[in-house]
């Protein structure tokens, strides 16, 4: 009885080790982007992102900041450049060992290291200057929590769109790039 209980506990524990990382499909008006999220290295950030996906927050938001050779940012503004309400800010997990390289997804934030809510960005270049250096306001970095596993050609098309200034915002695409749907796969 004890042996079979131990064996069952071992098998169930082993299954957890090989559990697949969560994946999210972003359906945009320029094509689909599939993200794989690193739940082990960024558990707080992944839980936060998936909560926004589950409640439909990203549907109808746009990539509102696009800078070729840097990143594409979205998840917080609607097509009229109005901010979507967001939940409480989360702890910055930029010290997790993941780095801001091309194809990774990270949380956008203000100058406060622990101010990330819903906005995220996809790096289109290796942006090592965004990596964690120290647990200080200027050295904290931006928390990477996943990567693009399908649809990098879509990301590369988005990074090339024409942009302009819109009110207080710069690098805003002239034509809206809309996240039509975000679903956990």
Predicted segments with their positions:
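Bacterial N-terminal signal peptides that target proteins for export
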Residues: 1-6
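Hydrophobic h-region of N-terminal signal peptides that target proteins for export
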Residues: 9-18
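Cyclophilin-like peptidyl-prolyl cis-trans isomerases
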Residues: 17-185
